Amino acid sequence: MDKQRLCIERELISSSAPIIWDLISTDAGLSRWMADSVTQEGEQLTFVWGELWSHHEVRTATIVEKVKNQYIKVTWDDEDGPDNFFELRMDKSHITNDYMLTITDFAWDDEMDSLHSIWTDNLARLRNTCGI
């Protein structure tokens, strides 16, 4: 049984490609909305959720594709298979002139609701902390 694909598209309240690109492709940007802490060493990303001195989760991932001001594709190091990645893609809306953020991720059938909820929370944090 294969994982199911989750695709979420949100319009961002920004027409600034450099600001959005920084938020989706750098450790400092991702730390503002996707995890409590993100560090980068080369193509390796380390995500930390929670506080290190208490309950927390740490996952590492590798950037496998990155096209500036377009998309970043990241694979989880603790998973195998063709569906072990997430992708963050930015596209400019020709109607509003703002950018759209498209998130592609994968989960097992029984984890789809949870994954959707995680990304919805992440997007709310992106809007609340960064104003976009």
Model-derived segments and spans:
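Hydrophobic pocket/interface hotspot
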Residues: 20-21, 30, 45-47, 63, ...
